[in-house]
C-alpha cells in the first residue's frame, strides 16, 4: 500500500500514524 506522507483521508488512523512514524 502506497499511502500519502500526510494522512488526511478518513481511512485507518492507526495505519496513518504508523506511516507518519515510519517517515
Swiss-Prot record:
One example GO MF annotation: serine-type endopeptidase inhibitor activity
| A cellular component annotation (GO) from this entry | extracellular region
Tissue expression summary: Expressed by the venom gland.
Family affiliation: Belongs to the venom Kunitz-type family.
Q: What is the lineage of its organism?
A: Eukaryota, Metazoa, Chordata, Craniata, Vertebrata
* Residues with site note (Reactive bond for chymotrypsin): 17-18
Where does this one sit in the cell? Answer: Secreted
BPTI/Kunitz inhibitor domain location: 7-23
Biological role stated in the UniProt entry? Serine protease inhibitor that inhibits chymotrypsin.
Kinase as a keyword?
no
Report what the protein is called: Kunitz-type serine protease inhibitor C8
Keywords attached to this Swiss-Prot or TrEMBL record, sorted alphabetically, are: Disulfide bond, Protease inhibitor, Secreted, Serine protease inhibitor
Amino acid at each position: 500500500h502506497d499511502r500519502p506522507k500526510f494522512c488526511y483521508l478518513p481511512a485507518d488512523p492507526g495505519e496513518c500514524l504508523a506511516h507518519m512514524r515510519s517517515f
